[in-house]
Amino acid sequence: MPKLLPLFKKMSIKLFQNDRIWTSIGNEITELANSMHAQGYAQNGPLTETLEQQLAQHLGRKHCITTGCGTDALDIAIQAIELPRGSNIAVSNYTFTASAHAIKRAGHEVVAVDVDSTYCIDAAGIPKSSAAVVAVDLFGNMSSHQKLQELGVPIIVDAAQSLESIAQGKYSAQHGMLSCLSFSPSKTVSSWGSGGAVLTDSDYLANRCRTLRLHGKLKNSQMSMGPGLNSMMSSFEVAAVLTGLKYAPQWLQRRTQIAQYLRDHSRHACANDFGLDQNTFSKLVFQAKDRDHVVKHFKNCGIDCVVHYNLLVADETIYTSNNSLTNSQYLRDISFTVPNQHTLTDSEVETIAKALT
C-alpha cells in the first residue's frame, strides 16, 4: 500500500481578524455593557450620550447623533436636508451601493459621478443640476472638499471608511453640512453588531436627525413630527465602540506601519493616499493590470484578497448614468484589497509582502 503524504492546512490570513480583536478587548466590552444592562439600559442609556459627546468632541463637530447603522445615518442625513422629492443627488460611482440606495429611499434621483485618482468623487464632473452631493471618502482617502464646498449645494460626507483620516488639519467627518459614520464589523472601530452616527454643526439639522432617528418624535414627546426610523444602537454596541475608540490611536499606528511596509515592498502601485496628514487605511488597496491573476495568486498563498467594489453604482440595474465613468470603471478593473488589520503578526505581514513582490 503506498504511503500517504501528510495533509497540511495552508496558512490563512484573513482580511478581517475580528476574532483576535475580541480576544484582546472582549472582556472589557462585556464589562462596560453589563454596567448598563444592570441598570436596565438596553438602549439610550448614559453610555450613548457619552459616545455621542466623545465623537463630536474628537471629530470637531457640535452635534453627534448615533444611529442603528451607517446606512441609517445616510438615510437620516439625506432626509434632514429636506430637498424637494425627486431631486438629483450626485454620488461617487465607485462606492458600496448603500451610499446610492439611501438617496433612492429618500425619494430622490441617483446621479452617479466618476472618481479621480483618489477613488473619491471628481468635483469637476458633478452636473450643475445636482441639488446635493454625497461625497464618499473611500478606503481612508479624502475628497477634494474645498472644491465640493464651492459648488454651493448641501454636501453630505460618507466617512464610513475614513473615521481617522485628516487633510489640512481637518478630519474627513468635519466636512460637509452633515457627515456619516459606520461601526459595522468591517470598520476600524466596530460595534460588534451594527451602528452609525450623523455629525453636524447645525442645531436645526441635529434636531431634525434626532427626530428622524426615533419615529419622527422629539425627546420625551409622544407626538410625531413626521415619519421617521427606529434607529438606535444597543448598549452593547455602544460599549464596543467606546472601547474601540480608546485603542484606536495605537491600532491606527500599527495599520499605518503595515501599509507603509507593504507599499515599500510591493511591485504594485498602492491606491491609498499617503499624502494626507493621516489616513485611516480602512482598506489597503493595490493596483495591477493582471488583477485577477494576482487575486488568484494571493488565494493560493492562503491570503484573503478581495475586490472592492466589483459592482459600481451605475452597474446596478436600478440606476443609470449619462456621465462618463471611465476612470471608476478602469480603477475597478485593476484594484484589489489585501489584509491590513492591526492584529496581523510581523510574520503575516512578511507573507503578504512576499505575495506582493
Could you say what each language-model-derived stretch is?
Residues E109, P154, I303-D304:
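Residue-level detector of anion-binding/catalytic polar loops
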Residues D19, P46-Q54, H58-K62, V134-V136, ...:
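PLP-dependent aminotransferase class I/II
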Residues S117-S191, A197-L199:
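Active-site phosphate-binding strand-loop segment of PLP-dependent enzymes
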Residues S92, P154, V338-N340:
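Short, proline-centered helix/strand-breaking motifs
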Residues A77-P127, A132, F298:
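Conserved PLP-anchoring active-site segment centered on the Schiff-base-forming lysine
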Residues M1-I76, A80, P84, Q260, ...:
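Conserved PLP-binding active-site segment in aminotransferase class I/II-type PLP enzymes
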